[in-house]
Amino acid sequence: MTRSLESSSIKPKVQIILASGSESRKQMLEEAGVIFDVKVSDTDEDKIKKQISSLPFSEQVVDLAKAKAESVSREFNEAVVIGGDQMCVLDDRLLHKPGSKEKAIESLKLLSGQKHYQHSGVCIFKNQSCIWHYSETVELKMHSLSEAEIINYVEMENPINAAGAYKFESLGCNLFSYVNGSSHTVRGMPLIPLLNALRELNIISCLLYTSPSPRD
């Protein structure tokens, strides 16, 4: 249901674009039956994070989601653009995507036996304007894990691009003793609120999550 998108391929009908390269967000939309295209934003996230670092994390994820969606909306003005962002926080400390197995192991050692939070923000842009945004926070507690368990998990799932260094949608869910909130939010996007917004804005239909206008 997805494809990579170039500027020349835009159609003059209802188009949904996910402004993210996140496999998890793509998977959730596909599982919901949404027909969409993908255009990864070229937003300088590090620069924006510095500018908004004093805000609560629940607001930061929305601002980052908006920046991504706005960037793509400028290029595809008539499209409906979905932006999303996620932050994993332990004791007010932001845990970045590890980027390597070694750093993933370090992150999981910090999270082992501890409560932490996953903040997810999502927005919808059209004509370079934000027409809806939302954020949600989930509290999680990880089991106390041995070093061997942590290393074994990292070797099995290689979660180097995951916020918190775990993939909750697969084996990572076994790491937790307690989760208070939506699994979709833990995976990186508050899916049900997003689907409700798309329906209320008449972007998708009520029963089948496809564009109300036929696509060529």
What are the residue ranges of the model-derived segments?
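N-terminal polybasic phosphate/anion-binding patch
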Residues: 2-80, 93-94, 145-148, 192-195, ...
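Residue-level signal for inorganic ion chemistry
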Residues: 29, 65, 85, 104, ...
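Catalytic beta-strand/loop signature of glycosyltransferases that borders the donor
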Residues: 41, 132-133
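Active-site-adjacent loop/tail segments of enzyme domains
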Residues: 60, 86-116, 142
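Short beta-strand segments
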Residues: 82-83, 121-123, 169
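Short acidic-glycine loop/turn motifs at beta-strand connectors
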Residues: 90-92, 125-129
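Active-site oxyanion/phosphate-handling segment shared across diverse enzymes
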Residues: 133-205
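A short, hydrophobic C-terminal helix/tail in secreted or cell-surface proteins
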Residues: 212-216
